[in-house]
């Protein structure tokens, strides 16, 4: 599942993600109602460094479960191809329900 993939990529995500991608992800997660405005503000205001924000963001998404993680992965693949490549992520080409990592392919239920 997507949550397992994000857990496996957590350290690398925290080290690699930029502030622009974090802000874009926060916007996407608010728009898709994965995170509330309050949760967004906590990530932005209570974490001083980009790495702290990345850690708080990813941990919040992982706690929300596999569908939330898939939204996060899809956003990364569509909006930050360099980060997606660094993490070995790619979203499925058609339905968005396929997640391919360097190690395995996971098919998420529709």
Swiss-Prot record:
A GO-annotated cellular component: cytoplasm
Subcellular localization(s) per the UniProt record: Cytoplasm
Mitochondrion in keyword set: no
Tissue: Ubiquitous.
Any Gene Ontology biological process: proteolysis
Keywords on record: Cytoplasm, Protease inhibitor, Thiol protease inhibitor
Pfam families, sorted: CARD
SUPFAM superfamilies for this protein: DEATH domain (SSF47986)
Residue intervals of the CARD domain: 1-91
Task of the protein: Regulator of procaspase-1/CASP1 activation implicated in the regulation of the proteolytic maturation of pro-IL-1beta/IL1B and its release during inflammation. Inhibits the release of IL1B in response to LPS in monocytes. However, unlike CASP1, do not induce NF-kappa-B activation.
Identification of the protein by name: Putative caspase recruitment domain-containing protein 17P
């Amino acid at each position: 599942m997507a949550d397992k993939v994000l857990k496996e990529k957590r350290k690398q995500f925290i080290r690699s993600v930029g502030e622009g991608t974090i802000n874009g992800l926060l916007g996407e997660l608010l728009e898709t109602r994965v995170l509330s405005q309050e949760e967004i503000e906590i990530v932005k205001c209570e974490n001083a460094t980009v790495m702290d924000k990345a850690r708080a963001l990813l941990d919040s998404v992982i706690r929300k479960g596999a569908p939330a993680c898939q939204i996060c992965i899809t956003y990364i693949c569509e909006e930050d191809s360099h980060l997606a490549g660094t993490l070995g992520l790619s979203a499925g080409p058609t339905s968005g329900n396929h997640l391919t990592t360097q190690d395995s392919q996971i098919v998420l239920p529709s």
